[in-house]
């Protein structure tokens, strides 16, 4: 299955999970297209100072992969600075957040996968 960039759904969301700013999302595939293999697959852009607030994963897990820039990712209270190519996976029963602490945009891939 192919999905061209100009066919992808986009959204701007405000203060996600209590975070700051209005991150933008480009959904690579819909949940229906993914057939239950993933609940969400999106490239998210955080402008300087923007964040996705701390949130739990209770019936799924979420992976972040930094594609451009850098971000501070906090999992279960432990903060790490991630750079291009670095990744984090928040499993069921854990919490995480992501914040662009830099002066340049940060782009990351976010994939939410259901528990099996």
Describe the role of every protein-language-model region.
Residues 27, 42-57:
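Conserved short histidine dyad/triad with adjacent acidic residue
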Residues 59-61, 65-71:
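Glycine- and acidic-residue-biased ligand/ion/polar-headgroup-sensing regions
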Residues 78-92:
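Short acidic-glycine-tyrosine-enriched beta hairpin
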Residues 51-52, 69-74:
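Short beta-strand segments in beta-sandwich/barrel cores
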Residues 72, 92-116:
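Ligand-binding loop in jelly-roll beta-barrel domains
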Residues 48, 59-60, 78, 94-95, ...:
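A generic "binding-loop/recognition-motif" signal
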Residues 1-38, 53:
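A short, N-terminal "cap"/entry segment at the start of jelly-roll beta-barrel domains
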